[in-house]
Amino acid sequence: MHRTFSALIAIAAAALFSGSASAQEVRIARQFSMGYLQFNVMEHEKLLEKHAAALGLKDVKIAWSIFNGPDAMNNALISDSVDIVAGGVPGLVTLWARTKGTANEVKGISALSSQPIFLNTRADHIKSIADLKDSDRVAVPAVKVSLQAILLQMAAAKLHGPANYGKYDALTVSMSPPDATIALLSGSGEVTSVFSVPPFQQQQLEKPGVRTILNSFDVMDGPATFTVAWTSARFRDKNPVLYKALIAALKEATGIVDKDRAKAAGYWIEDVKSKLPLDKVTAVISGPQVRWTMTPEHTMNFAAFMASVGSIKEAPKSWKDMFFPEVHDLNGS
């Protein structure tokens, strides 16, 4: 009887350890754009599987998926349909604020990249956003809620005062980056300006007459995180060893992107089935203002602004409030 009871205890303990230290499948989601190269590298070179195995977690399976926007992706995370997601900083800020102090609390894993976003125009009369007329239309991925729409609000607040942050909202229209690029380059139609993402913003600038009137780094007062990865405290707490492997995989992937941009560009082309030539993609991800880094940069600017306009209830006291401790030793902001 005593041996039977001891055996049951051992089995229960083993099951408890297994549930807290590993996961048979990790579901990772990202969005379209060139902001997630670490994930492309991790998928192709099986880095998470490698680091998990080195820590004793064998046969970990990774399921990769792509979402069209942050809302659906965040809903999938909250409903436990995915484990790890990546997108723009406002998506993280929104979900962090919504889940703070709850059982479903969400925080950032790390930044992925700092890249400038360009507001490009084809209209001769537009030299800056101050020249936008009621007849102009600015294409953004999603009005009012996308990274680009929020950047335009921040720029308006800087130029016209905080109370007028929504001055240009009525001029914005929702349009995917590919469709917005076609609309801009056609030279006709109501869209005169586009706030987009790489590589579309670079493609737009290849056409004579198209020029940049706003750089997001100017709005953010310096280099700013473009893409970031986040997850739930539930997933991190349940899988501490796997989470350690994830951080190691992200570090290795970031190093690979830094050292071999052409390799990373090739992975991205393959994953999105892009027809862009390798040298052009490599040039975009190697731009003078592009940095592949896990360090969050100027994320507090987004949070403070979103709190000031009521998008979230209150801003975090520090960027560290929005990120798990594994990156707290970085010189973030």
Identify the residue ranges that each predicted region occupies:
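Secondary-structure end/capping motifs
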Residues: R236-K313
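Short, glycine-/small- and polar/acidic-enriched structural segments
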Residues: E25-Y165, A170-S174, S188, T192-P198, ...
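Cleavable N-terminal signal peptides
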Residues: A10-I11, A21
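Small-molecule pocket liners
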Residues: L37, S113-L119, V210-R211, T225-A229, ...
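Sec/Tat signal peptide C-region and signal peptidase I cleavage site
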Residues: F17-A23
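Conserved C-terminal helix/tail region of periplasmic/extracytoplasmic solute-binding proteins
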Residues: M306-S333
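Bacterial N-terminal signal peptides that target proteins for export
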Residues: M1-I9
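Pocket-lining segment of extracytoplasmic ligand-binding domains
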Residues: G161, K167-D169, P178-E270
